[in-house]
């Protein structure tokens, strides 16, 4: 029973998405998580401890580091992943509710075969529940697109594309301009650009998924209208042909045939007396 329920849930999750949404977006999300977990702490774990300022003024180093990084890049990326995953989690919860509701409605899941087979057919034919799921999927893609774009803009505003090797600090309680140095700026720059590229690909593929969904829906609508018009023309032609056929008399015997043909028969024409006009 659990296996059938999971198959139905997975089928309902993937029936509205394209290969981009089924494969590329989850792979990029998993790659981002692995990259953060495996390399993030090693690259940015020492950013505060190795942040060296040329001063002995108490509190100056902490104030300069706060001015240089108001938000740690590692914490920013973790927050970004969680924030981007929220729309997908909400959509999965909505789909789970939809599947449970239909599961209880169908009793023992008799609609499983129809649901799985429906992935190969037209997915816009089902009723209002399927349409709500489709719009929920589009809404979560739109939310992810907005969140990814906002995160990319905020990342560029906070960190730019390159991690500098030194930073000139002018903050209290520092006396004048203080120069601070960072450890391994090149490694941090490479990781910063990598995370920027992964976020850019996620943004691009999310937009591509929306475009493919729109094109697919337009194609199915056009195909449905085309098939409907062909069916209407065929039905109209058949109706007219049937009407024309029904208007003709049904000939069953020779006498009925002779009555149906306008004028007289050949035998009656021979028996007609010859008048002066015929002579």
From Swiss-Prot:
Residues 238-279 are annotated as: Disordered. Keywords: Cell junction, Cell membrane, Gap junction, Membrane, Transmembrane, Transmembrane helix. It is a multi-pass membrane protein. SMART domains: CNX, Connexin_CCC. InterPro entries: Connexin (IPR000500), Connexin_CCC (IPR019570), Connexin_CS (IPR017990), Connexin_N (IPR013092), Connexin_N_sf (IPR038359). GO terms for molecular function: gap junction channel activity; identical protein binding. Its main location: membrane. PROSITE patterns: CONNEXINS_1, CONNEXINS_2. CNS specific. Expression is restricted to brain, spinal cord, and sciatic nerve. According to PubMed:12881038, expression is abundant in skeletal muscle, liver, and heart, and to a minor degree in pancreas and kidney. Residues 44-75, 154-194 are extracellular. PANTHER family: CONNEXIN, GAP JUNCTION GAMMA-3 PROTEIN. A connexon is composed of a hexamer of connexins. Belongs to the connexin family. Gamma-type subfamily. This is Gap junction gamma-3 protein. The lineage of its organism: Eukaryota, Metazoa, Chordata, Craniata, Vertebrata.
């Amino acid at each position: 029973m659990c296996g059938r329920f999971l198959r139905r849930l997975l089928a309902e999750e993937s029936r509205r998405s394209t290969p981009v949404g089924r494969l590329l977006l989850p792979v990029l999300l998993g790659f981002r998580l692995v990259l953060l977990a495996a390399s993030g702490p090693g690259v940015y774990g020492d950013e505060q401890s190795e942040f060296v300022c040329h001063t002995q003024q108490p509190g100056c180093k902490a104030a300069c580091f706060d001015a240089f990084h108001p938000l740690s890049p590692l914490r920013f990326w973790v927050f970004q992943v969680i924030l981007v995953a929220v729309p997908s989690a909400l959509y999965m919860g909505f789909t789970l509710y939809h599947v449970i509701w239909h599961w209880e409605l169908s009793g023992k899941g008799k609609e499983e075969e129809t649901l799985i087979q429906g992935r190969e057919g037209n997915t816009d034919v089902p009723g209002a529940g399927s349409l709500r799921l489709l719009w929920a999927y589009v809404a979560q893609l739109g939310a992810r697109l907005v969140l990814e774009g906002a995160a990319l803009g905020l990342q560029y505003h906070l960190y730019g594309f390159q991690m500098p090797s030194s930073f000139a600090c002018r903050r209290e309680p520092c006396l004048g301009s203080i120069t601070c140095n960072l450890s391994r700026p090149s490694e941090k720059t490479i990781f910063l650009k990598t995370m920027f590229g992964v976020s850019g690909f996620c943004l691009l593929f999310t937009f591509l998924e929306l475009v493919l969904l729109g094109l697919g829906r337009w194609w199915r609508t056009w195909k449905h209208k085309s098939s409907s018009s062909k069916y209407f023309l065929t039905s109209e032609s058949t109706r007219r042909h049937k009407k024309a056929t029904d208007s003709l008399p049904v000939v069953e015997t020779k006498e009925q045939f002779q009555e149906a043909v306008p004028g007289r028969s050949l035998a009656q024409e021979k028996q007609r007396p010859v008048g002066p006009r015929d002579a």
